[in-house]
Each structure stands twice: as C-alpha cells, then as structure tokens.
C-alpha cells in the first residue's frame, strides 16, 4: 500500500538534507499517517482509514461524510 492519505491524497515530499558544511543531499519527507477507526454517521458503522494528521484535524471540523464527498470516495468500500 502506498504511503498516501486516503482522504486528501497527501504524499511524501522531495527535500534536501543540509549538513553543517551546507552540502545538500536529497531526502524524502514522509507524511505522518495514522490508521484510524472513525464513526461514519450516515452508514451507522466504523470506517478504518489511513489518514494524515492534517486530515484528522480537518475531519474534526468538516466531518467524514463531507470530506469523503469532496475526495470522491465511497465509504461503503472501507
């Protein structure tokens, strides 16, 4: 499974690791992904998703149904 948020499609970022002498080498900044069981009110059940912590924060404000509709995700498949 790809390291990608299932709601926002957030993925890893290319960056540089900069040493003390300012030499730059490429590195990857991974997304902070967490497995979460979230209560889906419309479906009357829990849904298990792999979400970024940014998506979790947004989820508290918008709700799982609204975010899934924006992302075009059918929660019945999870």
UniProtKB/Swiss-Prot annotation:
InterPro entries: Ribosomal_bL28 (IPR026569), Ribosomal_bL28/bL31-like_sf (IPR034704), Ribosomal_bL28_bact-type (IPR001383), Ribosomal_bL28_sf (IPR037147). One of its GO terms (biological process) is translation. GO terms for molecular function: structural constituent of ribosome. Keywords: Ribonucleoprotein, Ribosomal protein. It comes from the Bacteria. The keyword Ribosomal protein applies. Gene3D superfamilies: Ribosomal protein L28/L24. One of its GO terms (cellular component) is ribosome. Belongs to the bacterial ribosomal protein bL28 family. This is Large ribosomal subunit protein bL28. The gene is rpmB.
